[in-house]
């Protein structure tokens, strides 16, 4: 009887964001601590550059998952604190939280639609080694589609003012090289990782619109820790309110349902032409789209 219920949908206990000091809160404050320590280590304690750089990469990697959960209101049950987590993570990454949220929700509404899925261009608009640069398209998409609500334009302006102020002060007081090498370059590294594991690998070959087939899972306990659950990306698309640390148990709870729906449950990069297609995307990645696409159901 229990398995029959699981074949219908995900169990309810996975759906709601918990309150308290949950993993997203822990990751957020860990990221803040890492950035603070690396900054003090560089300027005050003569830490080696590679330690400061690595600490900032890890901090931004953690922030990338927190902002993602916050955009779905699944970082924390308290909406105000969820927004704080989202805005704080966005500032660490150099993002604007309302842009990330509205554009990301458009991705969920139009997965693999060349015209309306903003992440489709991020994944397929050129070589993978330039995927981080294509995240700037999100800002263009945000304004072109006029996606803002209520005070989100003000929030965008303040976010951009924050970054601009740091850059101006860095130029004025001679620490721009630190900003470039220990903030922007780590953000570039994390941007490549986000583009690869949040956008490219889960949705390739970018053709399916069916909700059960427009993303994939590739189960792995190790990857679940390293890329913070994004190897269960289909689970996230089917039930976006699940926090990242519940993707793996939610996957195993719903695996009979995913099997019945013939969902893609492997990475498939080494299968036949997929490997050569991946190499093409790494170095060139240009695609030509027809006007017809597979409909969702």
Enumerate the predicted regions with their spans.
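Histidine-centered catalytic micro-motifs
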Residues: 63-73, 100-113, 199-205, 226-242
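Transmembrane alpha-helical segments that form the membrane-embedded catalytic/substrate-channel core
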Residues: 57-67, 96, 100, 185-209
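Long, highly hydrophobic alpha-helical transmembrane signal-anchor segments
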Residues: 45-89
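Non-catalytic, topology-defining segments of multipass membrane proteins
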Residues: 1-59, 90-185, 244-297
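Membrane-helix boundary/juxtamembrane motif in polytopic membrane proteins
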Residues: 154, 183-185, 207-217
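Juxtamembrane helix-capping/reentrant segments at transmembrane boundaries
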Residues: 75-95, 113-126, 210-223
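Long helical/loop segments within the catalytic core of UDP-sugar-dependent glycosyltransferases
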Residues: 58, 219-230
């Amino acid at each position: 009887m229990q398995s029959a219920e699981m074949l219908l949908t995900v169990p309810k206990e996975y759906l709601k964001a918990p309150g308290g000091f949950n993993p997203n809160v822990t990751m957020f404050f860990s990221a803040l601590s890492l950035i603070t320590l690396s900054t003090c280590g560089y300027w005050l304690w003569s830490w080696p550059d590679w330690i400061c750089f690595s600490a900032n990469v890890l901090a931004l990697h953690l922030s990338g998952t927190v902002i993602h959960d916050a955009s779905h209101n699944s970082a924390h049950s308290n909406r105000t604190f969820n927004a704080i987590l989202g805005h704080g993570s966005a500032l660490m990454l150099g993002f604007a939280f309302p842009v990330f949220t509205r554009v990301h929700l458009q991705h969920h509404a139009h997965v693999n639609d060349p015209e309306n899925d903003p992440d489709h261009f991020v994944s397929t608009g050129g070589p993978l080694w330039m995927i981080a640069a294509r995240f700037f398209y999100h800002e263009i998409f945000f304004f072109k589609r006029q996606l803002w609500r209520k005070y989100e334009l003000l929030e965008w302006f303040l976010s951009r003012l924050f970054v601009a102020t740091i850059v101006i002060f860095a130029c004025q007081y001679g620490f721009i090289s630190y900003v470039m090498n220990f903030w922007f370059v780590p953000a570039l590294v994390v941007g490549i990782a986000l583009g690869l594991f949040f956008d490219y690998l889960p949705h390739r070959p970018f053709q399916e619109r069916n909700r059960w087939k427009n993303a994939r899972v590739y189960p792995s306990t190790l990857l679940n820790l390293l890329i913070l659950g994004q190897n269960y990306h289909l689970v996230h698309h089917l039930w976006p309110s699940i926090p990242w640390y519940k993707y793996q148990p939610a996957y195993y709870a719903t695996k009979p349902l995913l099997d019945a729906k013939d969902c893609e449950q492997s990475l498939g990069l080494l299968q036949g032409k997929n490997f050569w297609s991946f190499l093409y995307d790494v170095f060139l990645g240009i695609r030509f789209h027809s006007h017809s696409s597979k409909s969702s159901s």
